[in-house]
Design a protein with these regions (language model features):
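A short alpha-helical cap/connector motif
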Residues: 1-112, 116-186
Length: 186
């Protein structure tokens, strides 16, 4: 299997958007933490919201198979797909893909939500994505930030509402330095 190598991974991230180099460095560090903790060479991953492929490139490096879903597939994402053989891209709305995947009984080891960050979108994606997880699968996502009323607080609200067990301590919420989060399903 052709895998993206470290040099290619760095190149993809450096080319993704040179104006956000500092952000990408932080993003890569947090995603590396998440990947090292939860992904192995046999993992199957679904990523909702791929944008320019920064996180997608890391998932391809760590996992056996990656399905990427985005409403608009960028040229950079198509370029990444040509560098690896473990990436399948779907250009459609997340809700549409999730419902189709459920009807096809697809299952994933890890699902990463990074599309629409509004409360309703995140909540609906979580409820659908739960049905696609393998036993002991990981539901995760990006942009769980606190104290920012203008940006992405829909993620925080939706996660805590769907998983009230977090506040009781019955479910562990993993947090990473790039604002990624993860919950292990039993």
């Amino acid at each position: 299997m052709k895998k993206i190598n470290l040099q290619t991974r760095r190149m993809v991230n450096a080319k993704a958007d040179p104006n956000y180099e500092g952000f990408q460095t932080n993003l890569l560090f947090g995603l590396d933490e998440l990947c090292e903790k939860f992904i192995d060479k046999n993992s199957t991953i679904l990523e909702i919201g791929c944008y320019n492929g920064i996180s997608t490139s890391l998932f391809c490096y760590y996992a056996k198979e990656v399905d990427g879903v985005d409403i608009k597939i960028s040229k950079k994402l198509f370029d990444l797909r040509n560098q690896v053989d473990n990436l399948t891209l779907y250009e459609q709305a997340s809700r549409t893909y999730l419902k189709e995947a459920i009807s096809q009984n697809k299952k994933y080891d890890l699902i990463y939500l990074d599309g629409n960050h509004s409360y309703n979108a995140v909540k609906n994606e979580i409820l659908l994505a739960q049905q696609l997880l393998k036993p002991n699968g990981i539901l995760s996502g990006h942009d769980m930030v606190e104290g920012n009323k203008r940006r992405n607080n829909g993620v925080l609200k939706a996660v805590y509402e769907v998983y009230p067990e977090i506040e009781k301590g019955d479910i562990r919420l993993y947090r990473f330095s790039d604002s990624s989060w993860a919950i292990k399903h039993l």
